[in-house]
A protein has these predicted regions:
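C-terminal catalytic domain of photolyase/cryptochrome flavoproteins
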Residues: 1-230
Length: 230
């Protein structure tokens, strides 16, 4: 969509990060639970789809195309016209959309506060207390030994809790800096108008309120889409 972002992530693609994402072994429980559910059911709500792409694009620093090709094989409702524009938007490479970076720990705390969803799809997490459910790597060694679960395991045994593949805060911060630096280049700035002219709505660009023009029925549907009652 925006050629100014070509080369931003492609040459730094980390295959180990990609494999960890596809295997539901990133170490972030909400991400791994979502991938597990997606593989089993072929469906996720919109917020969690956006979170997966955001995690792939920022802390894991994966290019949107391989991630999108993989997700396309997982979604039962895959629709190319929606899918690929969303991949680029959530990756911050359209040049015309606000950058949205989803913190998988905060998403879990906000949308699965009691851990029902995570525990449903990650059996290993069922015995982890709420205090450490979304950050199990912080659990004291004595507690791990008591529960019979251990972080940092590389094996796929039932007792293995995976360490995060990267430091979330540091990796996200570095990704934002790289994206911001690219946005300041003359090439990206010059191409923005062409992207707006081709892809953005012609009516009142930049002035419309998304919430003000939407019907109550649409807002109700959004609320249902963001829920975890499956």
């Amino acid at each position: 969509m925006h050629r100014g972002y070509d080369g931003l992530r492609e040459h730094d693609f980390n295959e180990a990060h990609f494999e960890a994402l596809k295997a539901a072994r990133t170490g972030w429980p909400m991400v791994d639970a979502c991938v597990t559910m997606l593989r089993e059911t072929g469906w996720l709500n919109f917020r969690m789809r956006a979170m997966l792409v955001s995690v792939a694009a920022y802390p894991l620093w994966l290019h949107w195309r391989p991630v999108g090709e993989w997700l396309a094989t997982q979604f039962l409702d895959y629709e190319p016209g929606i899918h690929w524009s969303q991949l680029q938007m959530q990756s911050g490479t359209t040049g015309i959309n606000t950058t949205r970076v989803y913190n998988p720990i905060k998403q879990a705390q906000d949308h699965d506060p009691h851990g029902r969803f995570v525990r449903q799809w990650l059996p290993t997490m069922r015995q982890v207390p709420d205090t450490w459910l979304f950050e199990p790597w912080l659990m004291p060694d004595t507690m791990q030994a008591h529960l019979g679960v251990f972080t940092g395991c590389n094996s796929y045994t039932p007792s293995a809790l995976v360490q995060p593949v990267v430091d979330l805060a540091q990796a996200t911060r570095e990704a934002k800096q790289l994206l911001h630096s690219r946005r300041q280049t003359d090439e990206v700035k010059a191409a923005k108008k062409a992207v707006v002219d081709k892809h953005a709505s012609r009516k009142n660009w930049g002035t419309r309120s998304a919430t003000s023009r939407r019907s109550p029925a649409s807002k109700k549907a959004d609320k249902q889409q963001l829920g975890f009652d499956f």
